[in-house]
Amino acid sequence: MKRRVVVTGMGAVTPIGNTVEEFWNGIKTGKVGIGPITKFDTTDYKVKLAAEVKDFVGKERMDFKAAKRMELFSQYAVAAAKEAFADAGLDMEQEDPYRVGTIIGSGIGSLSCVEPVSY
């Protein structure tokens, strides 16, 4: 059985832009998303650079209470998914939630949860 996948909307939260428009403009202008690590103290580490998401405020992109309960990487995913739904012209109040989906990739998940138990 052949199955078709249809991409109808896009969303982005990246080191070079927190929306699709910002991301695309960053690509076109050659914006560099790599810089000094700011999310934690790097004194005891050799690596000092990373591609961190900057200037992201989750409570501006989703329900404040929901954002407060989520790890930051989950907030990125929800914000990008909401942008993709809006880009597709979907009103989630009107759509059948069983007919709408999104694919989200995360290479490692929540470092704030992994790091404290890794030593």
Give the positions of each predicted feature.
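Conserved "HGTGT" condensation-loop signature of ketosynthase/thiolase-family condensing enzymes
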Residues: 1-119
